[in-house]
């Protein structure tokens, strides 16, 4: 699984070259998700024909593959639907046959791109093989288009002419597991269906004017009412299986069509609404429209400003300039979002990772803007206010996350324990679900995710919701699954993070969690002075980050002369800084391709050095806090054993001055702040070391090998 993108134009003439370019640009916007192959499907030269182009490797290889066919890129299409995909091999190895899109047969009657895992694909494959279908790949996805064809052919034999979304529903009923998929078909030209269950999909709408967007058909149909009828009437008969009169359809409406006294009146919608027949387009003709579909809303930022998020079990059907959403439940919502294009371009930087490291001065301001008041020493979190009573009477706090988000939770755990005086657990999302942890109604569960779509974290969230715990989301993407399914939350306002390495999201999550701890403990009189100290320190963190970034020339020299020849690193930390060591070690593995291990300082003597060869570089966090004397003692032992540690310490810390002059140690001096925030400053030198080690080794830092933004649910 990896990235999905689709593009549909209706009554807007586009050349084949323009359509291909749009699909390729969409895939390039998803490149920050690690992938190893890509492909697209577009209409062929003949009516009702679909062509597939796919290739292993980077998107540039796909472009070269397409060029080999000498396509007529000037061929115009007044209406067209194309789909595209980047794949990271899960089911089936890395070979061209396993790349998406997948087809139903050599004629490409049905073509599918898919994210997720179909858990019953072996049974489906056996059934379809028995029916005479030939499989060319090792993937679970290939069973989907073949199942489409099998059900379609069977329905035709029985005399049924099913609509595309009805056919899709019959297919989905046979699938077990998770999916986000797009399907096109030669039997339904210029149409596309999208469906999701456990894997995100978002649809962007674009017209020639805002009015066109406000009045595009978005028809919400009740799945049970719709599909159980299995109405065989086609669109040509004028009936689109509507569960309500067409006059109630609205664009991007927050409430479904008015069908009963229990539903909100459509006039409460904050968007313009009305019947498309009551607000005809110019000259009474259908409105020209464009639709963009993606697994990640950030990839739509350059095209649209309004998007619709599909919920689990929803089916979206796009045709004739209309978007019909067949809902599993009432109340599918729409969102407006704004993402400045400058935030998804590299600008003057060589790559996105470098850009995002330097953006931390600004992103740490953004997460605090309007929330931290240094004059009143208060933290205001409007996203949590409605749950104030439940949150402050929590008997236990559980933070659940994966990867770098897990490290940010570990970094914030001590301050939660200190300020809240309740037990605080930090859990890896996958392990949390596997153990069926005990969760109670008076627990507060905090879910932290960079994308808001991390599969394991979403599974943990669903588990906690069933246990009736209060849930908080800390995410960067508004409208993501975690932000919508949690009771309340804090948006980190970090902006798009295109690099695989989590840099600015880590520091923003760290600050967001500290702010939650400050907000939840506001009623504890005994913590007033401690809270004031932290709030005052928060306000100067952005300027202190700027000071830390001034270490870059020293770090470049250090990587060039002392570090790049090593392939093993040890990182030492204790207290708040153990999380910094974990995050730093993770970055070095992920970006620099070196073995790095994070160790509690007092564990160093327990045979760790015995298994490390060639006197590996040791990076120690020794900034001032309650553990400083013990860490200094540990560093002294390393020096005595002929080690040459790299020490991250505070400015003006003179304890290693003599050793520094002798060349025994290298110090990276960072500004001093309160202990619970020091990790924000300390992790940045490790980000820079990871970055420059990779650059010195000619590694592509934005797309390191074998990394993925979200893992499949296996």
From Swiss-Prot:
Pathway: Nucleotide-sugar biosynthesis; UDP-N-acetyl-alpha-D-glucosamine biosynthesis; alpha-D-glucosamine 6-phosphate from D-fructose 6-phosphate: step 1/1. Gene3D superfamilies: Glucose-6-phosphate isomerase like protein, domain 1 (3.40.50.10490), Glutamine Phosphoribosylpyrophosphate, subunit 1, domain 1 (3.60.20.10). Residues 387-526, 559-704 form the SIS domain. GO terms for biological process: fructose 6-phosphate metabolic process; protein N-linked glycosylation; UDP-N-acetylglucosamine biosynthetic process. It is an enzyme of class 2 (transferase). Residues 266-285 are annotated as: Disordered. InterPro entries: GATase_2_dom, GFAT_N, GlmS/AgaS_SIS, GlmS/FrlB_SIS, Ntn_hydrolases_N, SIS_dom, SIS_dom_sf. Keywords: Aminotransferase, Glutamine amidotransferase, Repeat, Transferase. The active site is at 2 (nucleophile). Residues 2-321 form the Glutamine amidotransferase type-2 domain. The keyword Repeat applies. It catalyses: D-fructose 6-phosphate + L-glutamine = D-glucosamine 6-phosphate + L-glutamate. Residues 266-280 have a biased composition (Polar residues). Its EC number is 2.6.1.16. Involved in amino sugar synthesis (formation of chitin, supplies the amino sugars of asparagine-linked oligosaccharides of glycoproteins). This is Putative glutamine--fructose-6-phosphate aminotransferase [isomerizing]. It comes from Saccharomyces cerevisiae (strain YJM789) (Baker's yeast). The lineage of its organism: Eukaryota, Fungi, Dikarya, Ascomycota, Saccharomycotina.
